[in-house]
Amino acid sequence: MKFAADLPAIRQAHARIRDSIHRTPVLTSTCLDDLAGTNLFFKCENFQKAGVFKARGACNAVFLLDEASAKRGVVTHSSGNHAAALARAAALRGIPAHIVMPSNSPQVKIAAVEAYGGTITFCEPTLAAREQTAQRVE
């Protein structure tokens, strides 16, 4: 499978989300470059808003929704990073975010979703339970 980046689509996504995200640094390490035998670059998305690297994709997806879809809100299942990112993106758009989280999710991730106004439904910590619960929530 071959993947070609769609530069115009990337630029459109950037224009859509740029006011809602941090411009995070790219760091380098001479020591690691030497060990790897090549130049390495580390994009520090851990410094992103909501503290999660999935903020860019969540914002882009939520901001792309048409008005009818947006009114219904968004639903996902996640134990953490995507949950927080989607709850934040939905809050920015002013739409509901319904987040299915396994009962064993870290408290810090639960608190992040709640802080962004996401409505959490807990389920058993299995993929099947998460998917079934998300379908019910829709």
Task: Indicate residue ranges for each PLM-predicted region.
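PLP-dependent amino-acid enzyme catalytic core
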Residues: 1-138
